[in-house]
Structures are given as C-alpha cells and as structure tokens.
Amino acid sequence: MKNKLVVVTGVPGVGGTTITQKAMEKLSEEGINYKMVNFGTVMFEVAQEENLVEDRDQMRKLDPDTQKRIQKLAGRKIAEMVKESPVVVDTHSTIKTPKGYLPGLPVWVLNELNPDIIIVVETSGDEILIRRLNDETRNRDLETTAGIEEHQIMNRAAAMTYGVLTGATVKIIQNKNNLLDYAVEELISVLR
C-alpha cells in the first residue's frame, strides 16, 4: 500500500501545528509513524543547498522565478520522502499579503506533492484573535475577526481547488478552545 501524503493547513494561530504534533505522538505509540515536515523549512533547505540564502529571511528576497523553482524542488523532495514513510506537510493553504491572497500550494507544487488528503484546521475568528494576542513568542500582524474569517473562507476555497486538481479529499477540523483533544482525535482518525 502506498504511503499517504497529508497536507495540514490553517491560518496563523489556529493551532494546526500543535494538533499535528500531538496526533503524531499518539500515532507513534500505535506504531504508525508519519514524518512531519514544514514546507517552508524544506524550501529553505533546498535554497541553502544551492547556496542561494544563508538565513530564512533572505527567502522572500529571491526573485519570483527562483522562488518558483525552489518551491517545485521542495515539493519533489517531500514527494521522495513519501517513498520511505507517510508524510504530513505543515503549510498554509493561502498566505495573506498586502496585494491579496497568495496560494500556499500553487499548481507546480501540487503536481510534485500529489497529496492524498488536505486538512483545513479552523475555529472562530474571535478565538484566533485572542490566541494571537496572547502569543508573545510571535510577532504577528494585528487583524480583525472579520479579516481572519475572510482568510479562513479563502483557505477553504483554495483547499477545495487543490482537491479538484489532485483528487485529494478535503477535511475540515474544528480546533475550539478547551477542545484540543477532540481536534487531535479527529486528525488521528483521518491519518490512520
């Protein structure tokens, strides 16, 4: 049986990384071992291997054609990992920029990854705003709940588009305050 490639997405502050890490720990206890990778980290590693950057901040300064090439190579590198074990890719469905929403998984990346499942982690805009305000470890842009909810709508639309292009299923998981265990269990049931 082919190893799964699962993409987990969500707006900053929704808790996608936390849910995924906890699910990985529990699955590991059952002998189910996914490799978890962050798409941006793999891109950075590829750019470093090519001596294009020394630190992660230099990534966004690369010209667009180079960035596309690095994205494609990162997708290919992750697809190679799936030959060895199932993989969960932690990334963003869309990235909110001053000029609009940028697809987190453009078609040249999707063609390389060919995911089996796309997970969209969500909760209310109010909950995300409060989490962001309480997170002193990150320097996030201040955003209204309406802006956060718009971003989540765009994530859903993008995720369904990714599903249409690849045949991947799309699963939405709610990560409500004080109900983390439910979200973790829901992710585990998808990953089994």
UniProtKB/Swiss-Prot annotation:
User: What InterPro entries has UniProt attached to this entry?
Assistant: Adenylate_kinase_AdkA, P-loop_NTPase
Q: What is its main location?
A: cytoplasm
Report the temperature dependence from the record.
Active from 60 to 80 degrees Celsius.
Q: Which NCBIfam families match?
A: PRK04040.1 (NF003122)
Q: What is this protein called?
A: Adenylate kinase
One Pfam match: AAA_17
- Please tell me where ATP binds in this chain: 10-18
Reaction equations catalysed: AMP + ATP = 2 ADP
Q: Which organism is it from?
A: Methanothermococcus thermolithotrophicus
Q: Subunit details for this protein?
A: Monomer.
One GO location term (cellular component): cytoplasm
Cellular compartment(s): Cytoplasm
Q: Of which family is this protein a member? A: Belongs to the archaeal adenylate kinase family.
Q: What is its EC number?
A: 2.7.4.3
Q: What molecular function terms (GO) are annotated for this protein?
A: adenylate kinase activity; ATP binding
Q: Which UniProt keywords apply?
A: ATP-binding, Cytoplasm, Kinase, Nucleotide-binding, Transferase
